[in-house]
């Protein structure tokens, strides 16, 4: 996309305060990374420094930032938003090339030159220095919560074999405090897009959720010794309000035969019982309930997304350029017919089609989960 758009890395930078929040987040994370790598190298721990770079590139840059921003690169003109996305990605990659230099000298040099590095070698350039003004710890915390919830919901989808392309109605979250709730509300729109749900709602208290505490005997046995039996009995007897308070505080103090025993959240596993039509996941002090029942309308939209996926694959297979417009004909089928009639404009917009019609054709036989049909592009 950058080559097609003629991106110029030397163009005037979009002011930091005008960058979208997602750009400011990755730049904040980048500068936090620089500080972390510098700290670990100064402490003679290159292994931890390398792992920080690996986590940033894989978890934050590739699997989150680039994936969330693909549509920003699709616009026909070089808008300020699009330029900000390119410049942000370029800054991240160039900085990573410099951070990588001590760990992967040859690859770092190749990446540096691919990005148009000014000097003969990355090893002659200055090592990155963190910009403290660009670091926003609150923003990083919000995005970390979004990443965590996304991971939990996607795991629940896999549990019942529901693809991400199939929209679901809602997730419900019992926030442990106002701070966590505010963080989640701030990223609700992003969450809806990323896990493909219509709504992100909050439960007052535990609502419909029933939680249980499961002790980790391997860890707790060493910690509490002879008190372990009493600790396990009291932990399993906690009611829903006590469990909620335990999650919020991060620990609970028990009295076992006149002796105090402090149990940390990390010592136990808090599990939630699944309820009809829902799946529930817990991780630390975060609980997410996913509604998995499918309405006819949700099924139609899911099929529309499946159709988009097949048409996009056909575009690639036929060697079309990313900017080429197409016309599409789909063979008659009850499921795809309903999806096309309900979501024709959406499908056309996603695959750059001027038209989409239902009719017999001599196109490519295309496989869906339960049937095959011809699609002509």
Name what the model sees in each region.
Residues 1-377:
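Feature 926 captures the class I aminoacyl-tRNA synthetase adenylation module centered on the KMSKS loop
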